[in-house]
Amino acid sequence: MAALHWLLLAALLGCTLAEEQAIFYNCEEASEAVCSVKEVRINPCNPNKKCIFKKGVNASISFDFEPNFASSKLVTTLYGPFDVEFDEMTNVDACQYTKCPTEPGKSQVLDYTLYIGKKLPQGTYTFKWKLWNPEETSQLCCFKTTIKIRK
């Protein structure tokens, strides 16, 4: 029985370690007084290197944010280089991936799994993630992080 507990603990620890904190910074257009991103976790990601995504597999992105606004609806968009929106992640109902309504000053987590398409070009990119109240677009959270896509 003790061996089973150790096995479960090791499995849980392995899952926790697989998703690492990513280096990120807030977007210029977002005010931390309105919404602050506290932590970004990406799998696969190594905190000592860039997050490296392999084509043809899924990557999971999770981030903690604290909105200072109340909203019953949230919309999210993922932007690639040159602020080009990803087709699959444009004006998506974010309430599918985090709790709605938001409450001012209450931390939340957004979890999303993204397929890394085989047609995406290899290279190192900065992407931007925006989350906002569609009824008041100045109420937004936003961060940027750098990833690498490889074969």
UniProtKB/Swiss-Prot annotation:
Glycans are attached at N58. The keyword Nucleus does not apply. Keywords: Disulfide bond, Glycoprotein, Lipid-binding, Secreted, Signal. GO terms for cellular component: extracellular region. The keyword Secreted applies. GO terms for molecular function: sterol binding. Disulfide bonds join C27-C141, C45-C51, C95-C100. Its main location: secreted. It holds the Pfam family E1_DerP2_DerF2. It comes from the Eukaryota. Residues 1-18 form the signal peptide. Gene3D superfamilies: 2.60.40.770. It is found in: Secreted. Hemolymph (at protein level). Constitutively expressed mainly in fat body and also in hemocytes and secreted into hemolymph. Not detected in midgut, epidermis, or Malpighian tubule of naive larvae. Transmembrane segments: none annotated. GO terms for biological process: sterol transport. SMART domains: ML. InterPro entries: Ig_E-set, ML_dom, NPC2-like. Binds to lipopolysaccharide from a variety of Gram-negative bacteria and to lipid A. Belongs to the NPC2 family. This is MD-2-related lipid-recognition protein. It comes from Manduca sexta.
